[in-house]
């Protein structure tokens, strides 16, 4: 696994067979070491913003990924799995509706830098596949929720935290969601799967209004806090049928409730009410 200097890896200590290489997308030597003797490359890396300049974000992510794919080609890697994003989409065709949800064949017209970078990398991935360097599979998740090594960085943590201490919250907007379990399962389902070569899969479980989510949190943890705000838009209907057909399971809002319970439990075990030095 390629990790940055200072990456949190304590939660991975139980996995004894992981070899760590400290490096980055800018470091070609570390990229070459990463893919040496590897059969499959899972590309999750993204040089983060927003503190970096646009030029730096483009150079590191796009040029760095091209270097990574080139090193994979030299090392004769058999398969590359690239974690893209549904933010490659921007403008929606007028034909998209609940009966005809957006699928993997919908044209991409990203509206922001992150989506544009992911879209550019997808293009390079297909170029390498076309040249028969290796098989490529692209996964496009929406907002991923799951417990992070730094618990306060977990999705919806702040809302759960405020309601756990009986504060009122003001919520607006909405989000598409998928659990980290489904994302991992997506990787497992395409790993070594010849039928997935050259394919794109949407990883999306559902869509929820943040106000609805807040009320779900309050009910789940028996909070006295109140949720106020406005409902978000209904969102663009998206299809996850292709992912389901290869075996990915999406468990809906029941999975969110289990996640809320887990975050609430971990808050108590690792610091409780706002003792963040222990998170």
Question: Which positions does each model-derived feature cover?
Answer:
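Glycine-rich NAD(P)-binding loop of the Rossmann-fold in SDR/ketoreductase-type enzymes
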Residues: 26, 56-67, 108, 112, ...
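Glycine/proline-rich active-site loop of Rossmann-fold NAD(P)-dependent oxidoreductases
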Residues: 119, 131-135, 145-157, 181, ...
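NAD(P)-dependent short-chain dehydrogenase/reductase
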Residues: 127-175
